[in-house]
């Protein structure tokens, strides 16, 4: 098994990525208005998230409203809801397995079993990172495509919100942490091999 420091590094990276997933799930900052308008006094900034949208006035006051229906969301945000929630759950399971199989814990006595549990945790982190990366990239692609769509007015166009950048960082940390843990796959060096022993044949005249 690899060193305790490598395991701790991978675990810390994954936990930070997991917290980033929770942040992007909660914050309504996936999309933001691209154009404020000519009148700064009456300007409004619109934020769109997975669960609510918010309006920020020029005075700094912000009002948020939960979506009345899931069907009111665009396809990318509908998929992002499910994928981000699943990613948070999968990553949490990976954190639990990492703690259970860590070299500095005594939850599992067998060292080979510990190594397998840690590798399984790495797989969970990789899956969680991919599940988080898909909706973030999908939403970013949708924002960029609509931004350059000539049929949409300036008020309908959006820019990339802070949640998308946080999501990219969180996915990268999860993928890195998962890769570090998967590199700790146990080797088969200690496996015992059975050696067949054949007794030497005695010569015909040995007992004469």
From Swiss-Prot:
PANTHER family: CLAUDIN. GO terms for molecular function: identical protein binding; structural molecule activity. One of its GO terms (cellular component) is plasma membrane. Disulfide bonds: none annotated. This is Claudin-like protein ZF-A89. Signal peptide: none annotated. GO terms for biological process: bicellular tight junction assembly; calcium-independent cell-cell adhesion via plasma membrane cell-adhesion molecules; cell adhesion. The keyword Transport does not apply.
